[in-house]
Amino acid sequence: MTRSLESSSIKPKVQIILASGSESRKQMLEEAGVIFDVKVSDTDEDKIKKQISSLPFSEQVVDLAKAKAESVSREFNEAVVIGGDQMCVLDDRLLHKPGSKEKAIESLKLLSGQKHYQHSGVCIFKNQSCIWHYSETVELKMHSLSEAEIINYVEMENPINAAGAYKFESLGCNLFSYVNGSSHTVRGMPLIPLLNALRELNIISCLLYTSPSPRD
């Protein structure tokens, strides 16, 4: 249901674009039956994070989601653009995507036996304007894990691009003793609120999550 998108391929009908390269967000939309295209934003996230670092994390994820969606909306003005962002926080400390197995192991050692939070923000842009945004926070507690368990998990799932260094949608869910909130939010996007917004804005239909206008 997805494809990579170039500027020349835009159609003059209802188009949904996910402004993210996140496999998890793509998977959730596909599982919901949404027909969409993908255009990864070229937003300088590090620069924006510095500018908004004093805000609560629940607001930061929305601002980052908006920046991504706005960037793509400028290029595809008539499209409906979905932006999303996620932050994993332990004791007010932001845990970045590890980027390597070694750093993933370090992150999981910090999270082992501890409560932490996953903040997810999502927005919808059209004509370079934000027409809806939302954020949600989930509290999680990880089991106390041995070093061997942590290393074994990292070797099995290689979660180097995951916020918190775990993939909750697969084996990572076994790491937790307690989760208070939506699994979709833990995976990186508050899916049900997003689907409700798309329906209320008449972007998708009520029963089948496809564009109300036929696509060529």
Label each residue range with its predicted role.
Residues 133-205:
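Active-site oxyanion/phosphate-handling segment shared across diverse enzymes
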Residues 212-216:
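A short, hydrophobic C-terminal helix/tail in secreted or cell-surface proteins
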